[in-house]
C-alpha cells in the first residue's frame, strides 16, 4: 500500500465546551477536564486556523442501540445520583457503580463522546475530510450491555459501524496501554474489521489481549494482539509498531482507519507503566497517516492530565502537518504545566522489561498469523443505509444577517490561517464579527483557487433543478455490513 510523507490533508475536529464540566467523582482518575485542557492548549498554539471545528450533535438512544442493547441504554438514560437506590439490581447487572460511577449528566457525557465519533465517521464517509479528530471519544472498554473501565458507550464501535456503510474493510488500531477489549469483542467474528492492539498484558486491566486471541469464525486471524511488559520505550515501540502495521496494511488493505490514541501509555501516567515520550507516541500517528487513508483519531485513556493535553495537542499538530514550538503558549491552564512549561516530556529511568528477543518472538508469531489471511476479502455491493446524522446546514452567506445564529452554528465558523491575525481584535473595529468573517471568506487568492479546483459554488434553492433533488435522494450502490 502506497505511503506518502508530509502530505497536507484536510482535518476536521469535534469539541463541545460542556465536556469538561462532567465529573466522575472525587478521587476518580478519569477526568473529562483533560479534554478542555487539550482544546485550550491547541487553540493557543493557533491550530484552530488550520482545521474545521465542529460542535458534535448529542447522539440519541436510537444511534447508541445500533450496537448496545435497548435495556442498557434505557438504564443509562434513567439513572441519576438521586435515584440510584431504585436501580441497585440493574447497576449490578450493567456493572455501574465503582470504576464506572453514576454522576450528574452521565448520559449527556456519553451523548457528546459518541456524537463526535459518529459525526466524524459520517464526514469521512462523505469525503468531506481526510482526517477527523474527536479527543472526547475512544472509550474502548464499553460492552454491548455493560459499562467497563470508565467507559459506558462504545463510541468506537458505533463509528466503525458507520464507516462500514461505505468502506469494505476498516482497520482499528489501539495504542492505549490497556487492551481494546470492547472493540475487539464487537468485531471478533467478522473479516471486515481488523482490530490491532498494543498493550500491557499480565495481571493488568482488563486481563484480555493474549497473543493467542486471534478472532473466531469468519473473523479468525482478524484480531491482532501484541502483549507488552512494563517500561517499553520509544525505540522498542517504533521497532514493533512500524513492521506490524506495514504487514497489516499489506495483508488487510483497509479503506479506512480508526486510531485510538490513549495517552496512558506515556511515561509518568498515573495508571500506566510504559515509558513512551509524546514524540514516540505521536510517531504512531505519523506512520498511520502516511498510508493516506481516511482516518479517525480518537482519545481514550490518560490519567496524568497535563501530559494528556500535551500529547493530544501535539498529535493534532501531526495530523495537520504543522510544527509547533516546545515552549508552551500561555493558556487558561498554564500553571498545570510547571515547572518547565514545555510541550515535550522526558522518559523516566525505569527498566524496559521488553527484551529484543521477546519483542522479536512476538512479532514473528504475529507475522505467521497475518500470513494466514486471505488477501483482502471481497464484499458484496449493496444499497447503503442512510447516514446516522443529517446533512450540515448550508452556506452561511445565504443566511439572514439580522437573525441571531445559534452557539452551535457559531462554533462551526473557524478562521482559516489567511483570514485573521493572531489577535482577537482586527484594527479599529475591535472584535472579529460575522460580517468581517464573510468579507474575509470571499477573498481568495489565485493560488488558493488552483489548489482547490472543487470550490463550492453558491447555489440558491430556486436554481436547483428537480432532477438534482431526485438524484440527491437516489440510493447509492455501496457496501453493506455482511
Swiss-Prot record:
GO MF annotation, one: metal ion binding
Cofactor list: Zn(2+)
Residues the record lists as N6-acetyllysine modifications: 74, 220
Region (Histone deacetylase): 9-321
N6-methylated lysine, modified sites: 432
Subcellular location: Nucleus
Catalytic activity: N(6)-acetyl-L-lysyl-[histone] + H2O = L-lysyl-[histone] + acetate; N(6)-acetyl-L-lysyl-[protein] + H2O = L-lysyl-[protein] + acetate; N(6)-(2E)-butenoyl-L-lysyl-[protein] + H2O = (2E)-2-butenoate + L-lysyl-[protein]; N(6)-[(S)-lactoyl]-L-lysyl-[protein] + H2O = (S)-lactate + L-lysyl-[protein]
Regulation of protein activity: Inositol tetraphosphate (1D-myo-inositol 1,4,5,6-tetrakisphosphate) may act as an intermolecular glue between HDAC1 and N-Cor repressor complex components.
Gene name of this polypeptide: HDAC1
The protein, known as: Histone deacetylase 1
UniProt feature, compositional bias: Basic and acidic residues: 401-416, 443-482
Biological process according to GO: circadian regulation of gene expression; DNA methylation-dependent constitutive heterochromatin formation; embryonic digit morphogenesis; endoderm development; epidermal cell differentiation; eyelid development in camera-type eye; fungiform papilla formation; hair follicle placode formation
Keywords carried by this UniProt record: Acetylation, Biological rhythms, Chromatin regulator, Hydrolase, Isopeptide bond, Metal-binding, Methylation, Nucleus, Phosphoprotein, Repressor, S-nitrosylation, Transcription, Transcription regulation, Ubl conjugation, Zinc
Sites of Phosphoserine modification: 393, 406, 409, 421, 423
Amino acid at each position: 500500500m502506497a505511503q506518502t510523507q508530509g502530505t497536507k490533508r484536510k482535518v476536521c475536529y469535534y469539541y463541545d465546551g460542556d465536556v469538561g464540566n462532567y465529573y466522575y467523582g472525587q478521587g476518580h482518575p478519569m477526568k473529562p477536564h483533560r479534554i478542555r485542557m487539550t482544546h485550550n492548549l491547541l487553540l493557543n498554539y493557533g491550530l484552530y486556523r488550520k482545521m474545521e471545528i465542529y460542535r458534535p450533535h448529542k447522539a440519541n438512544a436510537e444511534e447508541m442501540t445500533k450496537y448496545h442493547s435497548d435495556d442498557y441504554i434505557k438504564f443509562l438514560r434513567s439513572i441519576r445520583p438521586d435515584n440510584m437506590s431504585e436501580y441497585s439490581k440493574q447497576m449490578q447487572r450493567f456493572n455501574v457503580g465503582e470504576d464506572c460511577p453514576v454522576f450528574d449528566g452521565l448520559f449527556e457525557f456519553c451523548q457528546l463522546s459518541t456524537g463526535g465519533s459518529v459525526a466524524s465517521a459520517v464526514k469521512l464517509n462523505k469525503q468531506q475530510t481526510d482526517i477527523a479528530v474527536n479527543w472526547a471519544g475512544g472509550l474502548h472498554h464499553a460492552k454491548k450491555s455493560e459499562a467497563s473501565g470508565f467507559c459506558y458507550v462504545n463510541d468506537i464501535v458505533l463509528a466503525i459501524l458507520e464507516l462500514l456503510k461505505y468502506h469494505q474493510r476498516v482497520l482499528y488500531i489501539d495504542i492505549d496501554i490497556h487492551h481494546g477489549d470492547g472493540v475487539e469483542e464487537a468485531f471478533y467474528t467478522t473479516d471486515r474489521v481488523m482490530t490491532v492492539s498494543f498493550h500491557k498484558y499480565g495481571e493488568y486491566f482488563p486481563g484480555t489481549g493474549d497473543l493467542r486471541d486471534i478472532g473466531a469464525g469468519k473473523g479468525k486471524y482478524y484480531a491482532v494482539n501484541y502483549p507488552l511488559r512494563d517500561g517499553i520505550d520509544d525505540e522498542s515501540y517504533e521497532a514493533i509498531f512500524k513492521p506490524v502495521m506495514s504487514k497489516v496494511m499489506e495483508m488487510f488493505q483497509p479503506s479506512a482507519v480508526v486510531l485510538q490514541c490513549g495517552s496512558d501509555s506515556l511515561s509518568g501516567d498515573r495508571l500506566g507503566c510504559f515509558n513512551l515520550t509524546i514524540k514516540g507516541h505521536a510517531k504512531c500517528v505519523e506512520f498511520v497517516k502516511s498510508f493516506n487513508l481516511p482516518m479517525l483519531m480518537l482519545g481514550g485513556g490518560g490519567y496524568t492530565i497535563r501530559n494528556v493535553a500535551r500529547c493530544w495537542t501535539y498529535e493534532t499538530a501531526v495530523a495537520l502537518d504543522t510544527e509547533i514550538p516546545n515552549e508552551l503558549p500561555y493558556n487558561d491552564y498554564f500553571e498545570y504545566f510547571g515547572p518547565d512549561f514545555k510541550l515535550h516530556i522526558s522518559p523516566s529511568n525505569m527498566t524496559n522489561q521488553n527484551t529484543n528477543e521477546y519483542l522479536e518472538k512476538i512479532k514473528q508469531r504475529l507475522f505467521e498469523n497475518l500470513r494466514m489471511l486471505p488477501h483482502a476479502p471481497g464484499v458484496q455491493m449493496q444499497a447503503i443505509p442512510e447516514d446516522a446524522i443529517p446533512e450540515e446546514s448550508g452556506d452561511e452567506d445565504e443566511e439572514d444577517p439580522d437573525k441571531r445564529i445559534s452557539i452551535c452554528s457559531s462554533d462551526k465558523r473557524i478562521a482559516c490561517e489567511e483570514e485573521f491575525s493572531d489577535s482577537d481584535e482586527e484594527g479599529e473595529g475591535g472584535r472579529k464579527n460575522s460580517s468581517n468573517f464573510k468579507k474575509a471568506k470571499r477573498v481568495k487568492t489565485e493560488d488558493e483557487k488552483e489548489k482547490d479546483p472543487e470550490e463550492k459554488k453558491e447555489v440558491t434553492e430556486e436554481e436547483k433543478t428537480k432532477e438534482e433533488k431526485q438524484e440527491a435522494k437516489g440510493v447509492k450502490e455501496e457496501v453493506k455490513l455482511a
